Amino acid sequence: MRNLQLSIEREVERAIEGVNLKDTRRCYRDQSEFVVLERFLTQPVVDQLLYEVDLLTPDVNRNYIPGHKKGGSVSFYALQNQAPAILSLYRSPAWLMFLSRLVDAPLMLCPEDDPHSCALYYYTQPGDHIGFHYDTSYYKGRRYTVLIGLVERSEHCRLVARVRKRGETEEIRETRIPMDPGTAVLFNGDTLWHAVTPLGKGEERVVLTLQYVTDQEMGP
């Protein structure tokens, strides 16, 4: 486990070295706390994560809420027992510092009893999707979402983000984002109106979701 943590940490540091922090922060601010880092993670990290995606497939819990979402997921509780690479990425000191610098706030892990703090989402059946929503935070501070693409074998299933330019109320564009393996998307869950379009027949998509907060206490 220790060797795996060190390996993940080294690869995360390598990935961060390839990012122009100044330009990325500017893009994040200009897009009202939203930015895409295409193919950010290195292949060794992606390979480790994909191994755990396959390992956890039998634990996928399918759910369907008419008019809102359909798909499968593996919660943080299952990841704690079977996904050391995913946990190493989620808890990576270098990763946490990098994200904190991007959002200009000291970020923390979610409490251990939050099942959504780190989870896998499997889109494997035709029509799997999530309707437009905010990742509303019930913490006292802000909560930030990071999406990591792992499996992207779809021409139809896309993250759709309605991005507003900072300081403007008028919507500037609707962005459709393919979550290629290693691509990372960072945003403030309370400010980004987003969805996932329906999966087509014979397609597959798997995304890792990581949540970070500025205050670990729940609000009233």
Residue spans for each PLM region:
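A sequence-level detector of short, solvent-exposed, charge-rich linear segments
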Residues: 3, 56, 60, 68, ...
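Catalytic core of non-heme Fe(II) oxygenases with the double-stranded beta-helix
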Residues: 87, 97-192, 203-207, 214-219
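Short, Lys/Arg- and Gly-enriched loop/turn segments at beta-strand edges
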Residues: 193-199
